[in-house]
A protein has these predicted regions:
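N-terminal secretory signal peptides
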Residues: 1-37, 62-63
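Glycine-rich active-site loop/strand segments that organize a redox cofactor
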Residues: 74-79, 155-186, 322, 328-341
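Glycine-rich FAD pyrophosphate-binding loop
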Residues: 136-161
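Active-site/ligand-binding neighborhood in enzyme catalytic cores
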Residues: 267-403, 414-417
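Mid-domain catalytic core of redox enzymes
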Residues: 397, 401-525, 529-534
Length: 654
């Protein structure tokens, strides 16, 4: 029968479960809408597993035994990308087999394809696609190139999510977002023109009302469009408090000392005395020797506690972690590498699916039949992918999807070898191809494992590439009148999941409707990063990944619905009625997080990016945006161009 204590515990648990069920229903978790096509969800991993520091692979194995098939991936949307929302469980499992040493030796059952290519590109993100295109442009179509991509569709983090909401097809980005208008005579401008992006300033939706026009951003980032700041229970405001307009900190429910520090920090300017004049000068090298947090404290007198409470991860979100984990040079690295206008007024441009539009344009240029229709922005954005055209025998360039490279090694001495062996998994089997040259355009976290004869100095270089996870949660809402009623189109907050969201008007090349207004359906993106201030940079990445991978779709969905309800219910928002769908894009290694010493080296050794860029290793050259230290698709393209040039000049020229 059990003790009275146990009976009471069971009764309390029954009441709690009943209350939870009622709350879930009020939030819309059991509504039959497009957010998911399954009913049962359980947590991916138990608290006990987390406390024993389980690896991501163990967490996924636990999930496979105890959870519904979609408990991790959740609803993936509609269209070509429906089964490729972020790193899906199958992509993660394939990658973790590499990390866990399953391919230290190739299996006896390996399938010999008999294929030999002039160039194999490992990685089908923007860097890999750009490498294939540049190889084709420079080497000619008589040379054969194969791109191996581990996802169900090309693009890497430059992919889209699509929803169908009240008859309107909505499109948004999974990761890589905007592109600045390039200098007209720059390499990037010439590259854009070569893929059909000849007029990089896009046309956007117009205001359609009803009601007075509200300024809207063209990107998902807070800028000059009207926005507000929310303070909730964490700040002694259980009913919520909104501050809209100027002088937010002056009115915020925070201690006077904190208020003064934040106001002083915001008013501080980057004087020339603080700013590097060129990469590698004395100022930039000193900044690279300290953390961004130390630099912020030194420059404006702000305390460590205030930085971590209000400016983390905001000041480091472009690198995935907070200022305590990053090199001080990250304050300037992007502007020094790409000194362009990125204002939301004139500089930032964005396809409806973010830089997925760039990836699609490159692919259409490589393989004209890959996307239906003409080579126009409108058709490339709107028309479906012809998957059958991607990997056709005899084509100059082939893109092989769902193919995870697990082994890259020279045949014999790298200095004398004529070929590189590449093994990859696909459909439960392992296959082998040969190449006269290889571009490693995937992420540093896989390249370091799969290049089997990588020399010690490059192994050491790759050990300095720390990566942080990110989740892009895309929330489709039937309208955004709840924001319009408050006089805002975006907002930020300092508690809960993520820290900002923004309504944006879409570029016309992919927008369903020519106008937008408060009654229009839209997608609100919530970017979630996982800083653990005070821990070493690499450890923060591991801790963040454990959190990202151990949380079920349903649990994240509940958090999003609760948070939106807390913030917006007072202006008429109803989660069960107004949320039409949620897609989670989990990126386990989304951002390079450069620790001090990454950009210019330390202890007399070169910067890791410089070591990998200097020359090919045998017949292998290295690309990917990682090497630049700046997560930017332009860096991906520039690194691809350098890698292909090295191979053509130093490896394939004989």
């Amino acid at each position: 029968v059990g003790s009275p204590l146990n009976r009471n515990s069971k009764r309390l648990q029954t009441v709690r479960n009943s209350n939870d069920s009622r709350l879930d229903r009020s939030l819309g978790l059991d509504e039959n809408i497009t957010r998911r096509d399954f009913l049962n969800s359980t947590l991916l991993a138990s608290a006990g597993l987390l406390l024993t520091a389980a690896t991501p692979a163990q967490l996924l194995a636990q999930k496979a035994q105890t959870s519904a098939p979609d408990d991790f991936n959740g609803f993936g949307g509609i269209g070509d990308y429906a089964n490729s929302n972020g790193n899906t469980a199958s992509v993660l499992e394939a990658g973790h087999r590499i990390r866990d040493g399953e391919f230290e030796n190739l299996p006896a059952s390996i399938v010999e394809t008999g294929e030999t290519y002039d160039c194999v590109v490992v990685g089908g993100g923007i860097s890999g696609l750009a490498a294939a295109l540049i190889f084709q442009q420079l080497a000619g179509k008589s040379k054969a190139c194969l791109v191996l991509d581990n996802h169900p569709i090309f693009g890497g983090e430059a992919k889209r999510n699509e929803f169908l909401v009240d008859g309107q097809r909505l499109m948004t980005h999974q990761g890589s977002a905007f592109f600045p208008v390039p200098y007209p005579h720059s390499f990037i401008a010439r590259f854009y023109e070569s893929i059909g992006l000849k007029a990089p300033r896009l046309e956007y939706q117009k205001w359609g009302g009803p009601g007075p026009e509200m300024k809207l951003s063209t990107t998902p980032y807070l800028g000059s469009a009207p926005n507000g700041t929310y303070f909730g229970a964490k700040f002694g405001k259980p009913e919520g408090m909104w501050l809209i307009g100027e002088e937010t900190w002056e009115r915020a429910p925070i201690p006077a000392k904190t208020r003064d520090e934040l106001m002083k920090f915001e008013s501080a300017s980057n004087s020339e005395a603080h700013s590097p004049r060129y990469p590698g000068d004395a100022i930039s090298r000193r900044l690279d020797s300290i953390t961004l947090e130390d630099y912020m404290m030194e420059r404006s007198g702000i305390s460590r506690e205030t930085i971590r409470a209000f400016l983390s991860p905001g000041e480091g979100a472009g690198y995935g972690l907070g200022p305590d984990a990053l090199s001080g040079y990250t304050a300037y690295a992007a502007d020094m590498l790409h000194p362009l206008d990125i204002s939301d007024e004139t500089g930032q441009q964005m396809f409806p699916d973010g830089n997925g539009g760039i990836a699609r344009l490159i692919t259409k240029t490589l393989i004209p039949e890959s996307i239906a229709g003409e080579h126009s922005l409108d058709d490339v954005c709107r028309k479906p992918v012809n998957f059958g055209a991607l990997d056709r025998a005899g084509a100059a360039v082939r893109i092989r999807l769902d193919s995870t490279a697990v082994w890259v090694k020279h045949e014999g001495d790298p200095a004398k070898s004529d070929f590189v062996t590449i093994a990859y998994t696909h459909g439960g089997k392992t296959y082998r191809v040969k190449a006269r040259s290889v571009v490693m355009a995937g992420g540093s976290w896989t390249t370091r494992h799969i290049v089997r004869d990588l020399p010690a100095d490059l192994v050491e270089a790759y050990s300095q590439f720390c990566r942080a996870p990110c989740m892009m949660a895309n929330v489709a809402v039937r309208n955004w009148r709840f924001l319009y009623k408050m006089g805002i189109s975006g907002c930020q907050w300092y508690e809960g999941l993520g820290n900002y969201t923004q309504v944006r008007k879409l570029a016309m090349c992919g927008a369903h409707a020519p106008t937008i207004g408060p009654d229009s359906p839209t997608v609100l993106t919530v970017k979630v990063v996982y800083p653990y201030p005070g821990h070493p940079t690499e450890q923060q990445g591991h801790m963040g990944r454990a959190e990202l991978l151990s949380t079920s779709f349903r649990d994240y969905e509940r958090q999003i619905r609760e948070q939106f309800s807390a913030m917006f219910a007072s202006s008429g928002f109803n989660a069960a009625r107004d949320i039409a769908g949620i897609i989670l894009n989990r990126w386990g290694h989304a951002y390079l997080s450069p620790a001090p010493g990454f950009f210019f080296g330390k202890n007399g050794k070169p910067a890791p990016g410089d070591a990998l860029r200097a020359a090919p290793f045998g017949r292998i050259a290295f690309a990917n945006t990682d090497l630049s230290g700046v997560a930017d698709h332009r860096s991906s393209i520039i690194e691809a161009d350098r890698a292909v040039g090295q191979l053509l000049d130093q490896v394939l020229s004989g």
